[in-house]
Amino acid sequence: MKFKTIQASAIKSAFEVLKDILNDVNLYFTPKGVQILTLDTARVALVDMFLDASNFEEYFCEANMVTGVNVTNMYKLLKFISNNDTLTLEINSRDYLELRIENSIKRTDTRFKLKLLDINEDQIEVPVIKMSVSTTMPSIDFQRICRDMSNLASDLEIIRDKQQFIIKCQGDFANQETTINCIDENFEGKLGGKYSLKYLNLFTKATGMCSSVQVMQEEDNRFLVLKYNVANLGELKFYLATKVSDD
């Protein structure tokens, strides 16, 4: 298995986010692309990242392959990536993942070997679920709202009421409500749920990777989905379970 991309910084940014959510994970390599699909340790959130083979400069994978890595250790190596670097990732044995970071301008070539892990984990299958509404907004605005509300409360409520996207929270000493008018997105219903700000603040660290975020809600309010693009390589989606009402 081997791939090469000039969008190395995007992969670095993705693992920078994932290291605070996941520990040891399996990477699923197929002829179609690379995927991480796993639950966090508390089994509250599901992470689904898929990078499409057709978007790499080079991609070679004849058969499906599963290999385990420690996300933090992987990021420690990817952290060496800077602007204009090219990343090559290759697996030639069961023991190591080989990473190569090249920069033609600086004329540098750095190579690493990361020890692989044997992770006994059944692959999760995400059922095809029709999302009822998707609200697109600047990722930096959504991050700021979540960060501000975490100073007031531990949870927030996200509501889509026709053309209004409402984010609100109730704290011990103050409440906050922010309303955004969605003039370009037609929706005639009303959906809402309560979600953990701890997790939302972890997910919104992906803001630096993508200028916009899609906040997707489904009719049964079982979970919320945040979707970010990983540059032009693919997408990173976070599924967060809706908190059960105390009522």
Model-assigned labels for residue ranges:
Residues M1-K19, D24-N151, E157-D247:
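DNA polymerase sliding clamps and clamp-related checkpoint/processivity subunits
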